[in-house]
Regions:
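Zinc-dependent metallopeptidase catalytic helix centered on the HExxH motif
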Residues: 1-50
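Active-site-adjacent bridging/hinge elements
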Residues: 6-11, 56-69
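Short, solvent-exposed loop/turn segments at the edges of secondary structure
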Residues: 27-29, 61, 82-86
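Short helix/loop segments within enzyme catalytic domains
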Residues: 39-61, 100-103
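Active-site-adjacent structural elements in folded domains
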Residues: 67-76, 109
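Amphipathic alpha-helical substructures
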Residues: 77-159
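Beta-strand-rich binding/interaction modules
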Residues: 134-135, 150, 154-207
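Edge beta-strands of extracellular beta-sandwich domains
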Residues: 206-216
Length: 216
């Protein structure tokens, strides 16, 4: 039963690590929601875990940001559960090393053991520990309701792509499949990649990233 796993997960996020303001409650619920995915992965395998977290996206409403306003005792959107879990899953993909991701979670719980923290402290810890600047990723998924859109087009042997529907400076790397797996680093400006000639319909973005795609 997922609720048993979820509430057990709060021993780490929401009990051991607790936010100073309920505006940052996404830290409690996002990471605890993701404990359900970790449990599913341990019991049934990685693809089952991926299926689980991706399956929760249909419950995300994007009605308001998952970070609430500070100093007024107000939470963010209830999306903090499923969107928060998908944010953590996306971060895991970008780190691209499950051992490092596991060490990050354990290190976070050692560093902030039995403390009250801010969401910003958690964000900065993840960036510093991973060696990857996640600031724009957090700005996008925590403080807006927009889901990034990767626009792309193929002409001859060139694939062009860019991010839209995103915060200024959004530069999240992305794994794609177009005649094989590749990593690209889109920005809001068009970039071009030389490829073998192929049908645009064979292009796909890795489903584990919480994004939308739009062929042009």
């Amino acid at each position: 039963d997922f609720i048993i796993v979820h509430e057990s997960g709060h021993e780490w996020f929401g009990n051991s690590i607790t936010t100073k303001d309920v505006a940052d409650m996404w830290v409690h619920e996002g990471f605890t929601n993701y404990s359900e995915t970790i449990f599913t992965t341990c019991e049934y395998g990685k693809e089952a875990g991926n299926d689980y977290v991706i399956g929760t996206r249909k419950r995300i409403q994007n009605d308001k940001p998952i970070q609430g306003p500070y100093g007024v005792n107000q939470e963010g959107s209830g999306d903090m559960y499923y969107k928060g879990g998908n944010l953590v899953h996306t971060i895991r993909q970008i780190i691209n090393n499950d051992s490092s991701f596991r060490m990050l979670l354990r290190g976070m719980n050692k560093t902030f053991y039995h403390q009250t923290v801010t969401g910003k402290q958690i964000e900065e810890y993840i960036s510093k520990t991973s060696g990857i600047d996640f600031s724009k990723v957090f700005d996008q998924y925590v403080r807006t309701t927009q889901i990034p859109v990767l626009e792309y087009k193929v002409k001859g042997n060139k694939l062009s792509y860019r991010w839209t529907n995103c915060v200024k400076g959004f530069n999240m790397p992305l794994k794609i499949n177009f005649g094989g797996e590749k990593w690209i680093s889109p920005t809001q400006k068009w970039k071009t990649l030389k490829i073998k000639k192929g049908n645009i319909n064979t292009f796909s973005a890795d489903r584990n990233f919480y994004i939308n795609t739009k062929p042009l």
